[in-house]
Amino acid sequence: MRRLSLLTAVVVAMVVGAVLWAQERPAYFLVKVTITDQDAYGAYRDGFGSVFQQYGGEVLAVSAEPTVLEGEWEATATVIIRFDSRSEALEWYNSDGYQELVRIRQLASSADFILLDGRQQPG
């Protein structure tokens, strides 16, 4: 009986671990933008919301003047964007709608985009 209980506990732990491993973690874009043509950049800004909303992302922070504690951080704007998963983040970034906006943004600014995996949130 004791062996059966131990075996059951081990199997349950393995299943729970597998389920947690399979769950996708949130993903975050950290974006640093230097705008060189405000008027042209306006077209990117105007189209961003409607394309972005289709993919369930959330803009967590936007700052024109972040507090630099170490190093150098030259940018007109710094943005942090959250998606529920890396796959959703990449689906948005690689979408036809957003890639059309990327071409506009690239003519009006220079930008650095990085994608970070978030930590798995406890259940």
Tell where the protein language model's regions lie, with residue ranges.
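Short arginine-rich
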Residues: 98-115
